């Protein structure tokens, strides 16, 4: 599980370099803000396109093989990127990363996690996966940013950082091949159903319900990206302090995800997801009406902590619904691909919505509307999780 968690973190380091190294990336490639955003957009579009096919492949190949190939191929592309090629080549690399990261890794990672634990411990399995991802994300980010600063913080230093990332990918790919179990009897059965799996999965109401849960929860995850500017622009906090709050919430991820997994196995997955949506609704509704006065700063920070815990708890358990809804193990990858293609569409529309609202309604109003929309979507997620509880646990959907 430690290797799965680390793999699930490391694989996203290269495509999302701009999150930690925004200006160094622009300087190295000589690109504008729009061009920088296009790099991530190309990766996102390729990822969405490859979720279903990647999941289908995950049902036909050993997760160990796919995870290893994903890490190694992504790392090799990273070595090319460390030379800072022309912008068209950089776009091509990001498009290929969409295939090597999402198409190869995601479905295999979810399937390997499901196979790792028995049915009654699925909450723990996915909770520990997300906890491992959160812990390694925070630790690696802190370490590598410090190394970057120590190397001089310039373009040559950034090239070395990219090479370190690439080396880490390749090395972890080799370790994953040696450590991850070669497979379970379920996956090694000879029964295969071809592309008809997509039709079978599409007929399962549970798949659409889980996709709704993931999508609405992921909208809340996108809402968390706006906590930093919300704190600085609405409450007048300094950028440094607001950024520190944002960085601090990252360390909540491993604790919240692991705890949610343990609780979910005790009280039920869908019950835990539903409770999380109740918390998210109350929290984001609070953001939507909270005036930006100095006397309410402590309440605002407390609400950020509460919302972050609920968001990270959800990320730790919502794919455990695959077992609770009795999705056939042979279709885990295909179902994951379809769910992810729908569930992660907020990557496309949430930043556009946020930008439009903040530009159209400057000041607190834009944030209040944005957070209000997320509160409303949390109700949709709550209804989906309650429907799963009413139908999915008693019978295979």
What are these model-derived regions, one by one?
Residues 182-210:
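Juxtamembrane intracellular "pre-TM" segments in multi-pass secondary transporters
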Residues 18-22, 141, 204-257, 315, ...:
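Extracytoplasmic gate region of multi-pass secondary transporters
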Residues 72-86, 279-294:
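C-terminal ends and interior cores of transmembrane alpha-helices
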Residues 93-132:
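Cytoplasmic helix-loop-helix junction between adjacent transmembrane helices
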Residues 123-148, 340-351:
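Glycine-rich segments within core transmembrane alpha-helices of 12-TM secondary carriers
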Residues 145, 166-187, 384-389:
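C-terminal membrane-cytosol helix-exit motif in multi-pass small-molecule transporters
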Residues 60-71, 265-278:
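Cytoplasmic membrane-interface "Motif A"-like loop-to-helix N-cap segments
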